[in-house]
Amino acid sequence: MSDRTEQVATSDIPRPTQNLRTRVVSYFPGLAVAVLIAISAQFLSEHYGAPATLMALLLGMSLNFLSESGARTVPGIHFASRAVLRFGVALLGARVSLEVLSDLGVSLLCLVTTALACTILFAIIVGKFAGMDWRLSLLTGGAVAICGASAAVALNAVLPPRQNSDRDLALTIVAITLLSTSAMVLYPVLASHLQFDAKESGVFIGGTIHDVAQVVGAGFAMSEETGQIATLVKIVRVSLLAPTIIAVLIMVTVLGAGAGQKPQKLGQVIPGFVLGFAFLAALKSMGFLPAAAGDVANDLSRWLLLIALGAVGLKTSVKEFASIRPSHVTLALLATAFLAAFIVVGLLWYRG
């Protein structure tokens, strides 16, 4: 085979040995498309109230043809869906502070923490009975239990690669976003029906709704006190993203990611973005991260994740969704219902 033939047969993704200028030129078209999708998604979110993450995915999926083999945009799309995503996840650490845990109280903190762990375990068990890949079940359970799209992106980045992982991530985010939007409308009504007081309503809203913005919307729609408590509880759930990622990472590296994969030493395989996440979380928790720097990191993380999700959408074909089994969406719905029921029962028991 000639050098020319070999060159044509290689991947659209640039080799690591290529110089920086060649990489930048190669990445630019696809990366520019992903950035434009993120800007458009944010515009739709600000002017029409649509969830930005969902808009980024749907806009990307509508332009899926740009990720077809041979297109000039392929290298940049791949870069955005991997490298940009991981950098955005690392910056999520600036949102995590262990200080908020002490403000909630031991009993309610135990309730929220136990609900998170049990929801993930519930999703894995139900997924196993439904014949689903355990990684997809864990991804779905983690997204429901912790913080929606951000948790899904972070967990997907540390889970072992699998076929159609980008498609599964996209579908998970779509399902979680729609469920969270429904919960924002229905859960305040349910809290009132159960005669929860402001504190109980705040714990219920913050402990069950997936997306941060929707927690804030539902909480403050009930009352100022409920909104503040709901936001605090949601921050606690976000804070638990770090130990969850570490636990998953230990599981897939020390115990082995699956059949045929040998266990590895944890120190050999911890991704740099996980270390960055942990480092920023530690700085935030110890008070060493200035508020201004934290705000910049939060904003940058949000934009990077929007860009990455736009790229994930670009790599996801609408036709592929036809091959999705209903069990995936059903699992997200069941996990959401389980989390809500767990928190309700816990609050009723806590009440006395």
From Swiss-Prot:
Membrane topology: Multi-pass membrane protein
Compartment list: Cell membrane
Disulfide bridge positions per record: none
Transmembrane segments: 24-43, 48-67, 104-126, 136-158, 169-191, 201-223, 235-257, 272-294, 301-318, 328-350
UniProt keyword list: Cell membrane, Membrane, Plasmid, Transmembrane, Transmembrane helix
Main location: membrane
Signal sequence extent: none
CC annotations in GO: plasma membrane
Pfam families from the UniProt entry: Cons_hypoth698
Family: Belongs to the UPF0324 family.
Full protein name: UPF0324 membrane protein RA0957
